[in-house]
Structures are given as structure tokens and as C-alpha cells.
């Protein structure tokens, strides 16, 4: 039974690897994916939520 399951999984894996469609690449229109040389603020904004709950019992 394990051999049958293994054969099925291997067949499904190989069938998934043999897709005939072209690779999907997003259109960037000459723009980079991330902002390049973006200025980083010297100080973080004042209103930031606290990621750690700090209340005491």
C-alpha cells in the first residue's frame, strides 16, 4: 500500500512540474520592485502602537 501511495505522490509531483504554460512575470514597466535610495526618517513617527502588551496585574 505504501508503494502505491508513493507512486501516486511521485506521479502527481512530476505532473505538476511539467506545466506547459509560460512563466508568469509581473510587468514592472521599467520600475524597480522596491523604492531605490528611499530616504529613511531620522526618528520614527510619534504615534506607534506598542507591539508588546505591557499592562500589569
Curated annotation (Swiss-Prot):
Signal sequence residues: 1-16
| Cell compartments where the protein resides | Cell membrane
Region labeled Disordered — which residues?
35-57
The Gene Ontology CC terms held by the record are: plasma membrane
* Keywords noted in UniProt: Cell membrane, Lipoprotein, Membrane, Palmitate, Signal, Virulence
Lipidation sites (N-palmitoyl cysteine):
17
PROSITE patterns per the record?
A: PROKAR_LIPOPROTEIN
Briefly state the protein's biological role. Answer: The VirB system could be required for the establishment of the replication niche in the host.
Question: Additional info?
Answer: Transcription of the operon is maximal in early exponential phase.
Task: Supply the name of the protein.
Answer: Type IV secretion system putative lipoprotein virB7
The organism named in the record is Brucella suis biovar 1 (strain 1330)
